Each structure stands twice: as structure tokens, then as C-alpha cells.
From Swiss-Prot:
Protein name: Imidazoleglycerol-phosphate dehydratase
GO BP terms, alphabetized: L-histidine biosynthetic process
Organism, as annotated: Methanococcus maripaludis (strain DSM 14266 / JCM 13030 / NBRC 101832 / S2 / LL)
PANTHER family: IMIDAZOLEGLYCEROL-PHOSPHATE DEHYDRATASE, IMIDAZOLEGLYCEROL-PHOSPHATE DEHYDRATASE HIS7
Location of this chain's protein in the cell: Cytoplasm
UniProt GO cellular component terms: cytoplasm
GO molecular function terms attached to this record: imidazoleglycerol-phosphate dehydratase activity
Alphabetized UniProt keyword annotations: Amino-acid biosynthesis, Cytoplasm, Histidine biosynthesis, Lyase
Length: 190
């Protein structure tokens, strides 16, 4: 079983995360930001990851530190994963009504994000849409994953939810075990 626990305790956030990469999509997520809980739940469900996440953040200031630090701990959990025999690459194109999200991933040890997300609104509930790209940057830098994404659509809820669903599907694909693979790199290491 590829299961990991990560804690982060700073002056801004206190986070406890449990991740089972080989899960069934069970989740219990409490960040204090209802829409963020919703899209993280979509990530877990569509990625078939069991995810337990308890966060106490400085939301009296804003949601930036909470979103950023969740990206950090989730990234660290995936970075802990043994890279031998994984498929390494994953991708997904997910529609949600008028919105469409495309995500492609390389778990190759080289953190880099190319994201095309232009919000139409500043907020979805108490969630700041400017934090969407920052979440993925925080995740990528800590997971050491190359991540590309593009989102189109009109409804902000649909756009961000489609993006997190596509993220889950692509991560599920990339983390799948294929015994034929060994280390998927001509270098011999990831």
C-alpha cells in the first residue's frame, strides 16, 4: 500500500494529511473553505485516492496560506511515493457543462507548471480564484512534478471543478503501477 501521512505546523496553518494512493476515492476534507473542500473531494474521488485532510488556517486574514500549504503537503505526500514501476505520465480532458479542463502530468522529478486559467470572477464563495494557479505551483514544487493545464468556460465553479477532476484523473493514471516499467527514465533515476 502506498499510504502517507504529512503534517505541517506553522504560524499560518496547522495541517494533517493522510493519503492512500491505492485507495477507492474515500475522502474527509476540512479546510475551512467550503469550495476548496468541494474541489479537493472531486480530486480524491476521480483520482481514486483516499484523502483525509484537516486544516486550521489563518482564514481571518484570507485563504492564501491555507490553499498554498495544502498544495505543499499534498505535493510532499506524492513526492514520498516510490517511483519504480509507475506509469509516470498522465493526462485527462474533462468537460463540465460549458467548461473543459485539460491536464497533463510527468512525475519525472522536474517541477514546472504551465497553466492557462483566466478567472472571470475574483471569488467562488470564500475561495479566491487567484489561488488556483498558486495551488498547482505549490503542489508541483513539492511533488517535483511537471504539470500543464488549460481551462475554458464561462461558469467559474464549473471551470475550477473540471480542473480538479482532470487533475485527479491524470494523477491516477500517472501513479498506476505497471510491473513492466521499472524506472521510466533513460537516466535510470527519477
Amino acid at each position: 500500500m502506498r499510504a502517507f501521512k504529512v503534517k505541517r505546523d506553522t504560524n499560518e496553518t496547522k495541517i494533517q494529511l493522510e493519503l492512500n494512493i491505492d485507495g477507492t476515492g474515500k475522502y474527509s476534507i476540512t479546510t475551512g473553505i467550503p469550495f476548496f473542500d468541494h474541489v479537493l473531494s472531486s480530486f480524491a474521488k476521480h483520482g481514486s485516492f483516499d484523502l483525509k485532510l484537516d486544516v486550521l488556517g489563518d482564514l481571518e486574514i484570507d485563504d492564501h496560506h491555507t490553499v498554498e500549504d495544502v498544495g505543499i503537503v499534498l505535493g510532499k505526500a506524492f513526492e514520498n511515493m516510490e517511483k519504480k514501476n509507475i506509469k509516470r505520465f498522465g493526462w485527462a480532458i474533462i468537460p463540465m457543462d460549458e467548461a473543459k479542463a485539460t491536464v497533463s502530468i510527468d512525475i519525472g522529478g522536474r517541477p514546472f507548471v504551465v497553466g492557462n486559467y483566466v478567472p472571470n470572477t475574483e471569488r467562488i464563495g470564500s475561495f479566491s480564484t487567484e489561488n488556483v494557479v498558486h495551488f498547482f505551483e505549490s503542489f508541483s514544487n513539492n511533488a517535483k512534478i511537471n504539470l500543464h493545464f488549460e481551462v475554458t468556460g464561462e461558469n467559474e465553479h464549473h471551470k475550477v471543478e473540471a480542473l480538479f477532476k482532470a487533475f485527479g484523473v491524470a494523477m491516477d493514471m500517472a501513479t498506476q503501477i505497471d510491473e513492466r516499467k521499472g524506472i521510466v527514465s533513460t537516466k535510470g533515476v527519477i
